[in-house]
């Protein structure tokens, strides 16, 4: 089966990993803008998380930190040293588990950085990009994470994308396409974890 592999890591990343907003009106668009209204609105609207607005001009860490559903994840990102990379000018896609998903997760300091960077895919992959990759790769898109491992995205029914980790556990995407200045957040209902194989992750 042909598989799409997303490789590489954004240059300059630090540490181990390098209510909806209102739609714009037609009067806000310059006549020279080649984008359609639908394309522009999709770039300027965001879902809310836990009742909090997610602002597209914030970086990923700022938006995650403003979510009441992700305080455990934010603490883990900071403790691991991975948080700094999510404030850079690179482009990242984060599969962000909720507090409820992380409640039973063991916070082993020795492996925390690895586990946090496994949740991050270098590059900007919204739901449309993921769907395109899934279709192009025959039903399963393999995503290379910042940790060096692999996540597998596939369809579960006609509209739902699920993500499987290296241990075979599958997470549903509960909230899609939270757009940030430096990437995309997808809220997931399970912590995605790498396997036990140690990998050397490049530090830029």
What are these regions (language model features)?
Residues 3-5, 22-204:
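Mature, structured domains of secreted/extracytosolic soluble proteins
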Residues 2-22:
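Sec-dependent N-terminal signal peptides
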């Amino acid at each position: 089966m042909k598989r799409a592999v997303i490789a590489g890591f954004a240059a300059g990343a630090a540490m181990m990993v390098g209510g909806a907003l209102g739609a714009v009106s037609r009067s806000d668009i310059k006549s020279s803008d080649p984008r359609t209204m639908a394309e522009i609105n999709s770039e300027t609207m965001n879902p809310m998380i836990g009742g909090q607005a997610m602002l597209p001009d914030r970086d990923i860490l700022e938006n995650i930190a403003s979510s009441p559903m992700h305080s455990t994840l934010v603490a883990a990102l900071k403790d691991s040293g991975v948080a700094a990379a999510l404030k850079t000018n690179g482009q990242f896609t984060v599969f962000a588990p909720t507090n409820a998903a992380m409640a039973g997760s063991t916070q082993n300091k020795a492996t925390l950085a690895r586990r946090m960077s496994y949740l991050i895919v270098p590059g900007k992959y919204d739901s449309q990009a993921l769907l395109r990759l899934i279709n192009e790769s025959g039903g399963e898109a393999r995503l290379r994470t910042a940790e060096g491992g692999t996540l597998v995205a596939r369809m579960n029914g006609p509209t739902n994308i699920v993500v499987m980790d290296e241990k075979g556990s599958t997470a549903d995407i509960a909230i899609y396409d939270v757009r940030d200045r430096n990437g995309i957040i997808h809220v997931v209902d399970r912590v995605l974890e790498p396997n036990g194989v140690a990998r050397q992750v490049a530090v830029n």
